[in-house]
Structures are given as C-alpha cells and as structure tokens.
C-alpha cells in the first residue's frame, strides 16, 4: 500500500495532539483511502520557508500552527474558502502539483461552541487564529472587538468591521476569547483585574490552548463562570482538515468521531 506523509508545522510543537488524532484516522480509514498516511510533528525554525520545507519533506498535506499561519497564507499557489477572507492558512494540501491553502480554524471554532446565541465577542490577540475567529464570528452576525497590546495587524480587523483597541475597552462581552500565546507561557493575556471585570459580565471564557488548566481558564473557574479550552476546536479543525487530506472521501463528521475517541 502506498505511503503518504503529512505533518504539522509549529514552534513550539511538542505539545501538539494533532499527530495522535490524525494518525488514528489514517489507520482507521486506510482501506477506503487506498494509502497509509503518516502524520509527523515538525518543529520549524522561525526563519524557515514553509513551502520549501513542505516540498523537501515530500508531504502530501500539512497543518500549520503558531506562529506560521499568516506566513503560510503568503506561500500558497492557491487559496480556497474562508482563508481568502481571513488572511491565514492552517491547512496545506498538494493538489495537482499546486500548494493549496485552506482555513479550518474558523469553522472549527464555531462548531466547538456549545451554544450559538452570543451577541458579541472580545478577541484577545491579533494573529492568524484571531483573524480566522473574527471572520467566522462576523459571518455569524456577532459584533466583534479585538484587543491587542500593539497596533500590529489591527488594520485587518478594522477592514473587517471589528472594533479595535490597544487599551482594554470599558464594555461587557458575551464571549471572551484568548487567542494569544500567553497560556503556552503559563501567563495571563491581560491584567488580572481587568480580566476579572470581563469575566464577571461575560457568558463564556474561551482559551484556544488545550490540554491543561491555563491561568486564563483558572481565573474563570475561580469566578465560577463557564469556560472552555481549545480541545473541541482542535478536533473539529483537524477533522475538517482530514476531509481535505482525504480529497473529500472521508466526511469531517466521520473523522471527528475517530479523533474524539482517542483524545
């Protein structure tokens, strides 16, 4: 049986559960796919050229995580779907010798929400994940605000119709989303007292990090407000990516079931 290689580019990458859940799917569906896929974690030096690495490693597809999602958008031969709007790519697929970029973070995040009746959201951070979330939430009719410590990237959100801030706005928000990398450094993304104020008036604290109780989620738990980590988003975006890797032979719902069973 033919072997195909896949992977996930990131820095850091050792925390990623993507190899676990994708390899479970490649094993489960190998007969239907007609090939055996193997999915590797790939630690990419910050200065690396993603496309060169992808081709050098002979990959058929890959996911892209922190901090490469915006750079991945720039190196694709073709961009499809909502990735065109959000300027960030988390899924790369070799299609007819062209490197095609997709974004499954956007829909993956929305599918992971247990309820869908939020009116507005505050996104902390302005990177590739934040862009994907803002695009999807705007598409779903929410008012979106973005708070970032610097002006970097905020022009994108302004063009999207988001309210942008470099200082914490004095407003209440239903959804407070941590899309920064602070949790990976075991830090809060924002001043503790300011965050407490948002949590006390909010309906859900959501951290894109997964696998441990982050300082962000720990504070929400302490204040007894609903909170959610990024585990379900990871599985949904991975299942949507797997559908692309399988050339749509395996619907994301089937991939999700397998991935959920192992993680």
Curated annotation (Swiss-Prot):
EC code: 1.1.1.25
Keyword entries, A-Z: Amino-acid biosynthesis, Aromatic amino acid biosynthesis, NADP, Oxidoreductase
Main EC class the enzyme belongs to: oxidoreductase
Residues involved in shikimate binding: 16-18, 65, 90, 105, 210
Keyword Chaperone belongs to the record: no
Key word Methyltransferase present: no
GO molecular function: NADP binding; shikimate 3-dehydrogenase (NADP+) activity
InterPro entries: Aminoacid_DH-like_N_sf, NAD(P)-bd_dom_sf, Shikimate_DH, Shikimate_DH-bd_N, Shikimate_DH_fam
Extent of the signal sequence: none
Catalytic residues of the enzyme: 69
GO biological process, one term: amino acid biosynthetic process
Pathway: Metabolic intermediate biosynthesis; chorismate biosynthesis; chorismate from D-erythrose 4-phosphate and phosphoenolpyruvate: step 4/7
Function recorded in the entry: Involved in the biosynthesis of the chorismate, which leads to the biosynthesis of aromatic amino acids. Catalyzes the reversible NADPH linked reduction of 3-dehydroshikimate (DHSA) to yield shikimate (SA).
Assembly: Homodimer.
Similarity field: Belongs to the shikimate dehydrogenase family.
This protein's name: Shikimate dehydrogenase (NADP(+))
Species whose genome carries this gene: Helicobacter pylori (strain P12)
Organism lineage: Bacteria, Pseudomonadati, Campylobacterota, Epsilonproteobacteria, Campylobacterales
